[in-house]
Amino acid sequence: MQLRQIISLFVVLIFCAACDTSLMVQSTGVLRDASRKFELRNGNRSVIYIPMRHLGTRVYYDQIQRAVDSLQKSGYVVFYESIAYQVDSAVQRDVYDRKFRKLTGNRLGLQQCIETPGDTVRVLRAPLYRKLGQRIISQPDYSFFLVDYETAVNADIPKNKLLDDFEYIYGTIKLEPCDYETPLDAPYGCKPIKAALKNKFDKEFIMQKREENLASLVADAPQQKILILFGTAHFKGFLRNLQARDPRWVKIK
């Protein structure tokens, strides 16, 4: 093969890789500037669900900030997503972190609803987003969205509770020397847990259990107007569970 052909082939391969990465960026939805809203009604009660993404443009998050501020001023109370630990010590948290990593392999849940670190890097390096001049950032803290913590409700389940419940049903997550020796911020190359258990944790705990919990809190809440800030992938499961508890809940838009 002549040098000119080799160079041409190399250019084509680079172009294809760039196209693939750019398509990946578009498919994640991180380039959308407009946030969606789902509105539910049950008599005098109103729920607005804003599906959150863990990566997005600054414009996208600015829009959510304005929506949250406006809706709170209209009397809506925020119910937000957060699986933050509720533990007594850093030692406990370290063990839970290693068990969580054993189960998910550095993932924070299902790949389609929470981006992997690898996806984040690919998105940030993608030619498409650089060309458009859009700055993709990670989801800011809720304080950025002007959430009123005096009234807001953490409508999620702590990560340690999810792990405890999983172990109660499926047995202890056994950590090996490799799990302790590998830093939490390093690539994970230890012996993985069985794929069937990973899938059960994702489906039954990361998804179903949290959706059931959110629906239960909303159904029993005294607030008449609720604004939910929760992951995009959880809306259908939340709605299904909410309507199972009370069929009078209807989706307006």
Model-predicted segments: where are they?
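Extracytoplasmic/secreted proteins, especially bacterial periplasmic and envelope-associated proteins
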Residues: 63-66, 213, 233, 237
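Bacterial N-terminal signal peptides that target proteins for export
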Residues: 1-7
